């Protein structure tokens, strides 16, 4: 997906994050790992009710959330089917470019996701991270 030609970006690498993710044995990684583990745990007592509500909101499929939002905008503000189609086309082109850019970064940095990191915390070479399989 990261090698697909974007619709509006010059190239898929244009939005690649910099600097790269922190090294697994760095203090920054250790801090972030432990924060995500504490806040992201299913029964976390470190997370506020507002943080839980926000996490549940964003746990929905991104594209489903995006389309639902576009539908709400179109229904509330657009009477013409052509203008509505244009809104959906442009917004989904932007969405596709974001996904292309994200996959480019995933492939380039080859870095694991938080869920995998936390499950494999005992195997990451960092003595200050404890896995939670």
List where the protein language model places each region.
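Acidic/polar surface patches and capping/hinge elements
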Residues: 1-133
